[in-house]
């Protein structure tokens, strides 16, 4: 039997629908919000509403943006001749944190997965081909995941773009920094050996 008032139960139920939030965590969050100053709760509510109302997809790269073009696509300092293809907007965040890339991005919106009914038409591959075949593009870097779906997506895009004469590369993968060889799987080790470079 729940002893909380209905409004608290409703918030617990809503919070527990979020990824990684179970009932106990949702309960703690709901009680925290209840005891927080009213302006903090109002700010949180307003931020959620603003997120839902303003955030959309960039018209160029399909990343998240609150403007027609995202900050990266609208930045004249970015190298517009290189496009890095990723599966989702969070992949951009990871790459940007590295500081190793200064080009533009293209978010596919997922990866090919025939078992789940996701083919090329369900992703933003057509839009990628249009961008990649422009005269200003010198390289397309494929940075999809290294799982089966990511590899299949990379192979499909690479094959199609090479037929169109586009220079295509794939991000390297291999042994992580500080990784112990005894814990590295065979595929990762194989890729690390194949992707070796001068030192």
From Swiss-Prot:
It comes from the Bacteria. Residues 81-176 form the Toprim domain. A zinc finger (C4-type) spans 58-73. PANTHER family: RECOMBINATION PROTEIN RECR. HAMAP family: RecR. Belongs to the RecR family. This is Recombination protein RecR. It comes from Desulforapulum autotrophicum (strain ATCC 43914 / DSM 3382 / VKM B-1955 / HRM2) (Desulfobacterium autotrophicum). The gene is recR.
